[in-house]
């Protein structure tokens, strides 16, 4: 949302926002976009599996007019919005037959970022991998190197030409994927079978490095951004950007500390009490608890990758699941516990599918908003503190007929309570 709002208040002529995300995040992104009440067009491209930035940029270049100017912006960076937008506008006249990049003036010899070498004519001389400490210090001394911010600007036809020249297999696969992908309601769901065959490679390696080292007719320019910037790529950098108390602790939620220093502690579901610790990341959510040293939080991916190896019963299942009509939170119970309790929210004007279940009954208690429940051939308007019982195999549907969220508590009872025990008869989102 902050990334979109950055450009909403600028004078840049925005034609459309294109958001590329994983399929799991589709409904979160939709909810966040709709809550902004945008007047601009938007499109969501859902990847079934991550393939790094090159395929994502390739797909984005193919879905709009070849003469459209595209600006690629990471959503986890912090900028001085006014300075960034001013720089983008000033540099946009270089887009003809060129790829524009933006670099950050280094403030110290960082080894965790890539670097871009440039000259006083803003010509890009090369992209450099994440250096060791000695090399990073040399870059600082030379003064012609900038941190790679991951921002790119180009006409779509120029980027497609780059893929034709340097990564033709990616271009071919992305074209085939788009031809076989579902496209409805501003959402493109990329074909999994085809997209997973695409090479997993960054735009830097696939396109930018050969573009700046081989002779060709496409120019590359780099413009220096010298305002506030941070790449929120870890809990450590998130902590650096958040408000801190006198002990350099960031505390979010119900937190009690004593003699603790330099910690990021967040809890959404329970009191967290810490005593005599420092330099820790503690994140307590409904579905998982993370405790990590700040110096090792870059390795969280390694920890996640070990979960199936350590215990096949450990599954990454989010306690809060998003749907096109709203969300639900699993409060208690599982598929085989005999009962399951959920808290469910429905957006204004939205409704669940007309459905039935073969192996469970349900009890709904309204706790917020104005709801209309269909139960077989009955339609019942309901308010907070009212209850309805839904027998096994009964047709039922929940609809929000008000202007605020409807929230209700659902108690399921049966011998099997999996999400696949559902028969849909009508659905506003094409899931029948």
Regions found by a protein language model. Name each.
Residues 38-43, 123, 216-218:
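A short helix-to-beta-strand connector/capping loop
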Residues 73, 366, 411:
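Catalytic metal- and UDP-sugar-binding loop of GT-A-like glycosyltransferases, i.e.
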Residues 1-72, 78-80:
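Conserved N-terminal catalytic core of the sugar/cofactor nucleotidyltransferase
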Residues 81-194:
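Conserved core of the sugar-phosphate nucleotidyltransferase
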Residues 408:
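Noncatalytic nucleic-acid binding interfaces
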Residues 60, 76, 116, 155, ...:
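Residue-level signal for inorganic ion chemistry
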Residues 161-388, 396, 401, 415-417, ...:
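Left-handed beta-helix
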